[in-house]
């Protein structure tokens, strides 16, 4: 089973994404900021990351840069945000995101991206 880490400071968003992913058979863990996420990854890297941009202590951009440079450079990551600005999307890709989705992310959209990026058959 694939392991997914949700990195978001909003508990309601983490619960929403967790419900979608667990119902599709993924193993899900959560972190409320980039620092906590990096600590979790040191124990065992994940197969996929869903990362918010605006978080305390270490934002999504900083987390993705650390992930790519030092931990697991090849693991797919989706950055999610309420911001639809092109400059935020460009910054997400520069930081190492494989995709940029606007919140709220639809269940089918999220599962399709995961399936595609993990090379799985349709969920």
Predicted segments, located by residue:
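Receiver (REC) domain active-site loop signature in two-component systems and cognate sites
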Residues: 55
């Amino acid at each position: 089973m694939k392991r997914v880490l949700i990195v978001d400071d909003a508990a309601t968003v983490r619960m929403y994404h967790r419900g979608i992913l667990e119902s599709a058979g993924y193993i899900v863990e959560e972190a409320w900021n980039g620092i906590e996420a990096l600590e979790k990854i040191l124990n065992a890297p994940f197969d996929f990351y869903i990362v918010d941009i605006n978080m305390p202590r270490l934002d999504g951009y900083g987390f993705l840069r650390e992930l790519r440079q030092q931990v697991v450079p090849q693991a797919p990551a989706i950055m999610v945000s309420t911001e639809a600005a092109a400059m935020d999307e460009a910054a997400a890709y520069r930081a190492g995101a494989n995709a940029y989705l606007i919140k709220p992310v639809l269940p089918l959209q999220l599962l399709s991206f995961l399936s595609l990026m993990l090379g799985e058959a349709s969920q």
